[in-house]
């Protein structure tokens, strides 16, 4: 035990009438929603990097957070893990996520870093044996160290490609050993700063082959989880190759991986790409590649990824409605890829940020479920496309332009516009949220 969270009680559900800030007002893990426990719908995860590894810096200022586990030794990494599991217990968090660099100290060589990773994975595994918290996903940090400044899989130096491949192998082994439900790849440096020194075709082919090797290794080791890619348009790279859902799907199709890899969709990244969160979720679901979500928000006045905790339940309800329409999560879940503000120094701030985020998502899920169960929106959607259910319309899709023209002339087809009823549906939505 550590004393970092001393005096903070375990967070329990007390209902909407509670004024206790250390209580859930909406998140009731055992509440049944559409035939499934709320906890099993949401599958909340705590992000190791933002909660325990982030020092509070920004582009204009250095570290503001002082944590007793900050440092590059295995003993401090073990302390960090102990604090993490104490927080999981306080929150009742069912899952966590990590990068290798979040949990182990950096070694002087790849071999030393791997030994450090294996040692801390053993420690985390021992903590998991005494905990109900499980691993939602693991991943490799292939963007922070200077060796990755020109990319990992897409790097012009084949030695960096080799280092990156070996690192991913080690992280996949760690994820499997800890019983992870997914493995994530995010290409923060897989992109370019200028086209003047970039070979787009070569870099795409390197990235495609890298991912094929990841999928091959999944089967070699018997990893039963899902491989996920997380799209983001830019930051830190000027232009990233995993720009958005549509771009990643095209990449997967190009390399024959559309049935092997799904997506981890983040709200903040969707906003950076000029989309809404629900757009990216709906598109991923329609393409059969929705796997998991990273839950956060951006400051709409800023032009960068601020990774704040969600606090707008009507906005989140739109997202969870799309998750429900897609059938809900299987191996995926809701990872809080969010960090407290750099002025939020106290341990209580870290706990309350997660309490607020979990309550916001729970409230959003309940609103989305009410509308989904009511069926009014889906009936309106079906009615809008009802014409396509007729035999003539279905047959048209397998005919030719000449045949369609002949039918238009013969039947004197002269279609008239129909209202999309947007305002009516927006009013309907507002009644439920």
From Swiss-Prot:
Highest taxon of the lineage: Bacteria
A GO molecular-function descriptor: magnesium ion binding
Keyword annotations: Carbohydrate metabolism, Cytoplasm, Isomerase, Magnesium, Metal-binding, Xylose metabolism
Cofactor: Mg(2+)
Keyword Isomerase: yes
Subcellular localization: Cytoplasm
Known catalytic reactions: alpha-D-xylose = alpha-D-xylulofuranose
Active site (UniProt): 99, 102
Protein family (similarity comment): Belongs to the xylose isomerase family.
UniProt subunit comment: Homotetramer.
Protein name stated in the entry: Xylose isomerase
Native source organism of the sequence: Cereibacter sphaeroides (strain ATCC 17025 / ATH 2.4.3)
Gene behind the chain: xylA
């Amino acid at each position: 035990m550590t004393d970092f969270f001393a005096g903070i009680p375990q967070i329990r559900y007390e209902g909407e009438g509670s004024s206790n800030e250390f209580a859930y007002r909406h998140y009731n893990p055992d509440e049944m929603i559409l035939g499934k426990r709320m906890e099993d719908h949401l599958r909340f995860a705590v992000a190791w990097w933002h909660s325990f590894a982030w020092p509070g810096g920004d582009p204009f200022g250095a570290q503001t957070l002082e944590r007793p586990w900050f440092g590059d030794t295995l003993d401090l990494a073990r302390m960090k893990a102990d604090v993490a599991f104490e927080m999981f217990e306080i929150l009742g968090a069912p899952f966590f996520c990590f990068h290798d660099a979040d949990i182990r100290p950096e070694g002087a060589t790849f071999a030393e870093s791997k030994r450090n990773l294996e040692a801390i994975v053993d420690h985390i595994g021992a903590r998991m044996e005494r905990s109900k918290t499980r691993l939602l996903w693991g991943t490799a940090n292939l963007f922070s160290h200077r060796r990755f400044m020109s990319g990992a899989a897409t790097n012009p130096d084949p030695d960096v490609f080799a280092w990156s491949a070996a690192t991913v192998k080690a992280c996949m082994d760690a994820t499997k050993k800890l019983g992870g439900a997914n493995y994530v790849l995010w290409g923060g440096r897989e992109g370019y700063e200028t086209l003047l020194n970039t070979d787009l075709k070569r870099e795409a082919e390197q990235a495609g082959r890298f991912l094929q090797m990841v999928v091959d290794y999944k089967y070699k080791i018997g990893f039963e989880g899902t491989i996920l890619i997380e799209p983001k348009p830019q930051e830190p790279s000027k232009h990233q190759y995993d720009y958005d859902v549509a771009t990643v799907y095209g990449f997967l199709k190009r390399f024959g991986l559309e049935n092997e890899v799904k997506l981890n969709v983040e709200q903040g990244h969707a906003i950076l790409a000029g989309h809404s969160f629900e757009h990216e979720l709906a598109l991923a679901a329609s393409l059969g590649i929705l796997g998991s979500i990273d839950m956060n928000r951006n400051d709409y006045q800023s032009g960068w990824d601020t990774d704040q905790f969600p606090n707008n339940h009507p906005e989140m309800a739109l997202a969870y409605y799309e998750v429900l329409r897609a059938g809900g999560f299987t191996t995926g879940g809701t990872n809080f890829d969010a960090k407290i503000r750099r002025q939020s120094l106290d341990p209580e701030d870290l706990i309350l940020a997660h309490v607020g985020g979990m309550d916001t998502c729970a409230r959003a899920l309940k609103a989305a479920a009410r509308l989904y169960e009511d069926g009014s929106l889906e009936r309106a959607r079906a009615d809008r496309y009802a014409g396509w259910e007729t035999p003539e319309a279905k047959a048209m899709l397998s005919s030719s332009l000449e045949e369609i023209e002949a039918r238009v002339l013969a039947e004197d087809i002269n279609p008239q516009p129909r209202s999309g009823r947007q305002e009516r549906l927006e009013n309907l939505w507002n009644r439920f949220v």
